[in-house]
């Protein structure tokens, strides 16, 4: 069974802090997993494995899912849990959680091992 926590946040253009954390510039990739183009409000929670990063994409959930399918191929497992799309790759060692967030999506990238 896979357990993970969802970190919610809200922000606007004037306020780039997330519950006491400052948002970081978004990389193009995180542990070889791509981020949606023009990702915003990246928050790195841990870069050492197991690692996690959260960001905001200005697109809907389905477009974000289509991006990951195009970039990584069909996921080993696709689940919809409480309005979130959960994509698992490489025997659940790489997990992408796509949640509705205002006019866009929040994307949680979780990497257990590479």
Question: Where does each model-flagged region fall?
Answer:
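Bacterial N-terminal signal peptides
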Residues: 1-8
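An acidic-aromatic pocket/loop used at catalytic or ligand-binding sites
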Residues: 9-114
């Amino acid at each position: 069974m896979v357990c993970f926590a969802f970190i919610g946040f809200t922000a606007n253009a004037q306020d780039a802090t997330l519950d006491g954390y400052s948002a970081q510039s978004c990389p193009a990739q995180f542990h070889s997993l791509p981020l949606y183009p023009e990702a915003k409000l990246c928050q790195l929670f841990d870069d050492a494995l197991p690692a996690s990063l959260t960001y905001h994409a200005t697109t809907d959930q389905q477009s974000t899912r289509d991006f990951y399918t195009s970039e990584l191929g069909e996921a080993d497992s696709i689940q919809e849990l409480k309005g979130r799309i959960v994509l698992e790759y490489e025997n659940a060692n790489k997990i992408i959680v796509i949640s509705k967030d205002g006019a866009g999506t929040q994307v949680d990238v979780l990497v257990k091992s590479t």
